[in-house]
Amino acid sequence: MSFELPALPYAKDALAPHISAETIEYHYGKHHQTYVTNLNNLIKGTAFEGKSLEEIIRSSEGGVFNNAAQVWNHTFYWNCLAPNAGGEPTGKVAEAIAASFGSFADFKAQFTDAAIKNFGSGWTWLVKNSDGKLAIVSTSNAGTPLTTDATPLLTVDVWEHAYYIDYRNARPGYLEHFWALVNWEFVAKNLAA
């Protein structure tokens, strides 16, 4: 079984003006596609062939892990975003954020700060720990919460390819616009899982 690039849940220009169609074309169409292609080439004829993406991530290392995790991380990231989204969460997500961080404003400030300070390439995540509390976790390179007992709820990609076309080296500007795209319905589904 080979993996395919999952379809975006919206048109390539749907996240503008926050994330341009050009960024999506390169980020999704080139970077994400390359991880899929590399993974398929790396697993061909190995014990990983025929396994799910999650199984590969949890049992591999090196190039296989890096490409599998990047395929999963990117697919998750695209679903964390939506046109006409953003704002503040409601319902159980709002309650969980308030219980863990005090307020949405405090959470947003802490998440943004963690993402800005995530050195180099990586991801910043909102996760639900096994005790039910929410936490902000930053991972480097292809790191993913799937290798832990935490449940990923939300992520932001802080690899430069995620924002360089639109924001150059200004990661804070990218993070400011990220909040206008957060798909809280997707976060709520992850929290309920």
UniProtKB/Swiss-Prot annotation:
GO cellular component: cytoplasm; cytosol; membrane
Enzyme class: oxidoreductase
GO molecular function list: iron ion binding; oxidoreductase activity; superoxide dismutase activity
First and last residue of the signal peptide: none
Cofactor names: Fe cation
Location of N6-acetyllysine modifications: K51
GO BP annotation list: removal of superoxide radicals; response to superoxide; superoxide metabolic process
Stored InterPro entries: Mn/Fe_SOD, Mn/Fe_SOD_BS, Mn/Fe_SOD_C, Mn/Fe_SOD_N, Mn/Fe_SOD_N_sf, SOD_C_sf
Enzyme Commission no: 1.15.1.1
Pfam families per the UniProt record, alphabetical: Sod_Fe_C, Sod_Fe_N
Cofactor annotation comment: Binds 1 Fe cation per subunit.
Induction remark: The transcript is subject to small RNA (sRNA)-mediated degradation; sRNA RyhB-binding at the ribosome-binding site (RBS) both blocks translation and induces mRNA cleavage by the RNA degradosome over 350 bases downstream. RhyB blocks translation even in the absence of the RNA degradosome. Deletion of fur derepresses rhyB expression, and leads to less expression of this gene.
Reaction it catalyzes: 2 superoxide + 2 H(+) = H2O2 + O2
Binding site for Fe cation: H27, H74, D157, H161
Top-rank taxon, per record: Bacteria
NCBIfam families per record: PRK10543.1
Function recorded in the entry: Destroys superoxide anion radicals which are normally produced within the cells and which are toxic to biological systems.
Family: Belongs to the iron/manganese superoxide dismutase family.
Known partners and oligomeric status: Homodimer.
Protein name according to UniProt: Superoxide dismutase [Fe]
Gene designation per UniProt: sodB
